[in-house]
Design a protein with these regions (language model features):
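Short coil/turn helix-boundary motifs
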Residues: 40, 118-119, 201
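A general nucleic-acid interaction/assembly signal
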Residues: 127, 133, 137-177
Length: 224
C-alpha cells in the first residue's frame, strides 16, 4: 500500500542503480513523465527502502515530480524493508526489468557483474532479470571484458568484439564509451557520406580523416 511523502526527501543512491549509466537519467523518459504529470497524469508509486528513504525503483519518476512541482512536490511511495543492500539491489533490478524503461544488454551485464561483486547467488540474479542461470552465464561471458586492474566491465553491442579479453587502456576507453551500434555500421555510414559529398570538411574533420587514413594503413599493412 502506498503512502505520500515529499519527493525532496527521497535519496538517489546511485550504488543501487541497476543500469550501467550511473549518475545519468534518460532525458527522454523524464520529459515524457513531466508532460504526463502536467496534464494531470498519475505515475505509479516509487519503491523506497523504509529505513533511509533510498529509492529502489523510481529515479525518473522522482526527478519528474521535482521538475514539475518543485521542492514541495508530493509523491506516492511504497516503503519496503530490506535486510541488506544486496537484497535492495536485486529488487531494483527485478523492478526495472519488469516495467518502465527497458534494461538493455549493457544494463543487464552491469547488473549481473554487480550482483557477482555483492555475492548474490546466480539463481537470484538470473530470476531478477528473467533469465535462467545457464543463459545468464553465457550472456555475461559474451557481454563483459576485464580491465588491466581486474575490473569486469559490461560491453555494448559495439564492443562485443572485446568480450572475454583483458583490455588495453585504448580498448577500455572504447568499451566504456561505445554505444549500441557495431563499428561496421559507422564504416558504411562514413563511406556513404563521403560518396554523397555530405561531409563538411572543416579543418578538424580533415585532421581526423588523416588520422583515420593512418589507422587504416596500419590495418592493411597487417593483412598483406
Amino acid at each position: 500500500m502506498s503512502t505520500k511523502m515529499k519527493a525532496i526527501e527521497l535519496v538517489m543512491d546511485w550504488n543501487m542503480w541497476p543500469r550501467q549509466s550511473a549518475q545519468t537519467l534518460d532525458s527522454t523518459n523524464v520529459a515524457r513523465m513531466r508532460e504526463f504529470l502536467r496534464v494531470g497524469g498519475i505515475l505509479p508509486p516509487v519503491v523506497i527502502n523504509a529505513k533511509d528513504y533510498r529509492i529502489v525503483d523510481g529515479f525518473h519518476r522522482t526527478r519528474a515530480h521535482l521538475d514539475v512541482f518543485g521542492d514541495d512536490a508530493d509523491i506516492q511511495v511504497i516503503a519496503k524493508n530490506y535486510a541488506k543492500d544486496s537484497e535492495m539491489f536485486v529488487d531494483a533490478g527485478r523492478l526495472n526489468s519488469s516495467h518502465g524503461l527497458p534494461m538493455g544488454p549493457k544494463d543487464r551485464a552491469h547488473f549481473i557483474a554487480k550482483c557477482r561483486k555483492m555475492k548474490v547467488p546466480y539463481i537470484v540474479a538470473a530470476e531478477a532479470i528473467g533469465m535462467n542461470v545457464d543463459s545468464m552465464k553465457k550472456f555475461f561471458a559474451k557481454r563483459t571484458a576485464r580491465t588491466e586492474s581486474g575490473e569486469v566491465i559490461p560491453l555494448s553491442a559495439g564492443g562485443r568484439g572485446l568480450a572475454g579479453k583483458v583490455l588495453t587502456p585504448a580498448q577500455e576507453h572504447f568499451a566504456r564509451t561505445s554505444n549500441g551500434a557495431v563499428p561496421e555500421m559507422y564504416i558504411s555510414m562514413l563511406i556513404n557520406a563521403l560518396r554523397a559529398d555530405a561531409v563538411q570538411l572543416s579543418d578538424r574533420t580533415i585532421s581526423r580523416l588523416i588520422e583515420l587514413d593512418k589507422e587504416i594503413q596500419v590495418i592493411l599493412d597487417g593483412v598483406e
